[in-house]
């Protein structure tokens, strides 16, 4: 069988206008340099860029098949990380974790405006391939490691694990009603990267009795850790999130396991967008007046926040309730990102109240938006 060259195998990005980040950064020369390289687990550059080939409109189009992908293919990953995270060069380093909820300033909002709060992060177990390349045996072992650790949680964090394969119709119905159940993903990243192989083998959901602390196992990331509750107490959600995450890490270490961590990139996740903290702190925020302001989108961006619809990404806002979160994941600690959300949401509510009173907000907007 003939051996084809890298240039013969180079993806066709030109015909779609290089809409994804990979298409903008991966040249034929770079591809040729990376073409023959393999990680210790056998992951190739083609495995990592497959989402960009199958769906050229995707923003990033790049996944890591294992933690080592970030180093072996760093020429491409570093370029994409630098663009995605607004400047993060080869010598930059992500700060150490900071889960100190007591150091937060504010964070308790009027439930008239903040309907609920949610904080999540992604984690990967050190020593295993990531979802795009993980084997069935590895995935099952990851499930075992995490479930064993969760069994050690006590008090308000104690809960029950529901494997997708063994779920009863009643359990499934309840989890759907709670909006907890993740179905087989159909998104381009998961499907094109191969992360949905063998579904639903070794996938499951765990939650505590109060349904305020939730774990997803083997979805886009090996572990998704989520804290949430109704109302406006963001600080309480971060406290529970931090306490649960710290306890899980401690229980894992007792059995000789830990989460994958890079001194430069922070916690390792499947998608480069989630490197660093992997943290997304969000609130459901009702803004009847501000959402009608002509600079609403610009105001959100000015506070380094991101806006989604009520149901999350690619949904519309219902009754002017928006999902507002931190935009970045890298270059700041967990506490700093939650504080950024708190500060920004506080300003948005301040503007909403002024508009409710029939006043202008033009004079109190960030300097970059005045005029």
Curated annotation (Swiss-Prot):
It catalyses: L-lombricine + ATP = N-phospho-L-lombricine + ADP + H(+). Its EC number is 2.7.3.5. One of its GO terms (molecular function) is ATP binding. InterPro entries: ATP-guanido_PTrfase, ATP-guanido_PTrfase_AS, ATP-guanido_PTrfase_cat, ATP-guanido_PTrfase_N, ATP-guanido_PTrfase_N_sf, Gln_synth/guanido_kin_cat_dom. ATP binds at residues 116-120, 179, 224, 280, 308-313, 323. One of its GO terms (cellular component) is extracellular space. Keywords: ATP-binding, Kinase, Nucleotide-binding, Transferase. It is an enzyme of class 2 (transferase). One of its GO terms (biological process) is phosphocreatine biosynthetic process. Pfam families: ATP-gua_Ptrans (PF00217), ATP-gua_PtransN (PF02807). Homodimer. Belongs to the ATP:guanido phosphotransferase family. This is Lombricine kinase.
């Amino acid at each position: 069988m003939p051996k084809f060259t890298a240039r013969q195998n180079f993806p066709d990005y030109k015909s779609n206008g290089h809409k994804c980040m990979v298409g903008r950064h991966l040249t034929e020369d770079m591809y040729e340099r990376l073409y023959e390289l393999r990680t210790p687990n056998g992951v190739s550059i083609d495995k990592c860029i497959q989402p960009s080939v199958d769906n050229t409109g995707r923003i990033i189009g790049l996944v890591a098949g294992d933690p080592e992908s970030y180093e072996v293919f760093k020429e491409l990953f570093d370029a994409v990380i630098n663009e995605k995270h607004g400047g993060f060069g080869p010598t930059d380093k992500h700060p150490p974790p900071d889960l100190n909820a007591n150091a937060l300033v504010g964070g308790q909002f009027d439930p008239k405006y903040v309907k609920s709060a949610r904080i999540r992060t992604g984690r990967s177990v050190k020593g295993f391939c990531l979802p795009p390349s993980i084997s069935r045996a590895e995935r099952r072992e990851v499930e075992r490691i995490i479930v064993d650790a969760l069994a050690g949680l006590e008090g308000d964090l104690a809960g029950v694990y529901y494997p997708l394969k063994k779920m009863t119709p009643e359990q499934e119905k309840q989890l759907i009603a709670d909006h907890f159940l993740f179905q087989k993903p159909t998104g381009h990243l998961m499907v094109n990267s191969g992360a949905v192989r063998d579904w639903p083998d070794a996938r499951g959901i765990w939650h505590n009795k109060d349904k305020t602390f939730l774990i997803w196992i083997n979805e886009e990331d090996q572990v998704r850790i989520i804290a949430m509750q109704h109302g406006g107490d963001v600080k309480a959600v971060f406290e529970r999130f931090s306490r649960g995450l710290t306890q899980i890490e401690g229980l894992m270490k007792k059995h000789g396991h830990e989460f994958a961590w890079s001194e430069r990139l922070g916690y390792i996740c499947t998608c480069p967008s989630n490197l660093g903290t992997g943290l997304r702190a969000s609130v459901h925020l009702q803004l009847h007046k501000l959402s009608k302001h002509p600079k609403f989108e610009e105001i959100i961006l000015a506070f380094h926040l991101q806006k989604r619809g009520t149901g999350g990404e690619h949904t519309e806002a219902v009754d002017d309730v928006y999902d507002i979160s931190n935009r970045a994941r890298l270059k700041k600690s967990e506490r700093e990102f939650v504080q950024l959300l708190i500060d920004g949401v506080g300003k948005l509510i301040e503007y909403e109240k002024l508009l409710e009173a029939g006043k202008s907000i033009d004079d109190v907007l960030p300097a970059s938006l005045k005029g």
